[in-house]
Amino acid sequence: TPVCSSAASDVYKRQPHLGTIKYSDNSFVIADIPGIIEGASDGHGLGIKFLKHISRTGILLFFLEAFSEISVQDQFLKLKKELGDFSEKLLEKEFYIVVTKIDLIDEETKFKTLNTFNAKEFRNVFSISSITGEGVQELLDDISRKIFI
């Protein structure tokens, strides 16, 4: 089951990237789908092309930057709106909220950011740092349990 990620950035790449994550004796395919910008569902950027790729995924990962001018909550709402405007079925998919770049924020800000999502009873909320590796293993463990069990 492919997993989809989407960054909430105004700067976007030109094509999706596929990768395989090996986990224990199993593996799964991930698809990094860039280009989901505001207005993507109306054809802005490369949005429609990329949104079609998302339709084929099993689990969505919303990668939201902790160290950004746009709050993680607003990033999430914008991405969710674009998905819903393209297809309501996308909003029915299981998803993860992954707050990235947590190495760039203090503990109090991290706590408040994650609590915002937890207060809304989202089950799959993780924070990671690609630089330090913090939280990455826990995220992979959880995704793998969902896929392989």
Describe every region a protein language model picked out.
Residues 1-12:
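Single conserved hydrophobic/aromatic residue that forms the stacking wall/gate
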Residues 9, 27-47:
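Switch II (G3) loop of P-loop NTPases
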Residues 10-27:
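AAA+/P-loop NTPase substrate/partner-engagement loops
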Residues 16, 43, 58:
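Phosphate-binding active sites in nucleotide-utilizing proteins
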Residues 18-20, 35-37, 66-70, 101-105, ...:
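Conserved nucleotide-binding/hydrolysis micro-motifs of P-loop NTPases
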Residues 32, 50, 79, 139:
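Conserved RecA-like P-loop NTPase ATPase core
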Residues 51-124:
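Conserved C-terminal guanine-recognition region of P-loop GTPase G domains, centered on the G4
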Residues 105-149:
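Canonical P-loop GTPase G-domain recognition
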